[in-house]
Amino acid sequence: MEFTKRDTKILKGIAICLMLCHHLFTFPERLDGVGFVSVPFINGMSFAMCMGQFGKLCVALFTLLGGYGAYLSCTRTGGEERFTARHLRSLYGAYWRVFVLAVPISLLLRQAHGSPFMEDLIYCFLGLRFTYCNEWWFITPFALLTVGFPLVRRFADRKNASPEGNFLWLIGGNAVIYYVLPRVMELPLLSAFAGTVFWTELYTTLTLLPAYAMGVLMAKYDLLSAAKALCARRRSLCYAAAVVVLAALIYIHPFNWLAYDFINAAVFIPCALALLSTRLGAFIAPVLERLGEESTSMWLIHALLCYHWCQKLIYAPKYAPLIFLWLLALSYAAARLVRLLYSIPARLRAARVKVSAAK
């Protein structure tokens, strides 16, 4: 069974749900006079806070799926330059569509902005600063990963490369990024460079590189299609294994996410595919697919709602599951509204053409 674009959308829908959990329930210091009620769980944490911490996996999931889609898209259509230009236009187009609506709303709500105003606005527009919403930080490293995709592809497709060798290189590279580079940058010779914005953005991109490369390798070896086929053949066994592995991932994630989320994400996806092959999974899959279609806009919008614009409204339901569903509904509705607003000019042009043709 082939891993399709629909499957990608469904997984993005899961990832955006994890992102909302992460931002809603992980940072009590960012809540101003509001809170949430959740049942106790493990290690002194509530279930909501545990799921919020696990929700950090969303970054690695989106990054891995980005690498997976990039490899397949470039393999099918060819032309790395065209691919890079097309994906950068898509990424920044989605960002700018929300940005030009968010800035005036933020100013009307008297949200603080950088000074001088125009300089700060230009930096924010280019994705070099995120005064209006820090959760937009993902724009820059993902753009850099897109630009660097040809190098990642050459690594994956190099002569005599084997799956085992590629994954060992990936694990070794991840160890260098997380354990060696920070020590090297502490050297007096490099201390000045280590404090620059350039290094900060570059290092953030490097920390996401293993997940992106993992996606490329999983696409090269068609591992997700193989996982989906296995789930179809051994449904009961895969379902039971997925439940156990997911429970283990949720439990250990607070202790290992920093350096190993590229592995956690690669393990999580086959588990999700196994659960989606059940009746309940098939029932909720269309909802997740719709969420996945709007996942980029929902990512850009939801943090504005829960941190900057209407926090008291978002946390009004009081109970964690209701808060999550409330923000999910509002974010999806706002994303659809953004899509509708930007479709109006095209609809008007189509209507004029139809009227002209009728005459």
Regions found by a protein language model. Name each.
Residues 17-24, 125-128, 170-185, 239-253, ...:
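Aromatic-anchored segments of alpha-helical transmembrane domains
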Residues 1-176, 290, 294-297, 315-359:
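Membrane-cytosol interface segments of multi-pass membrane proteins
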Residues 148, 155-169, 223-245:
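Hydrophobic alpha-helical segments of polytopic membrane proteins
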Residues 212, 239-348:
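Alpha-helical transmembrane segments of multi-pass integral membrane proteins
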Residues 6, 116-123, 184-188, 204-221:
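Hydrophobic, membrane-facing alpha-helical anchors
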Residues 145-154, 213-226, 269-283:
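Alpha-helical transmembrane segments in multipass membrane proteins, preferentially the mid-helix core
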Residues 47-59, 128-141, 181-213, 247-271, ...:
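Interfacial loop-to-helix transition and helix-capping segments at the boundaries
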Residues 97-106, 123-131, 191-197, 221-230, ...:
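Short juxtamembrane and helix-loop transition motifs at transmembrane-helix boundaries
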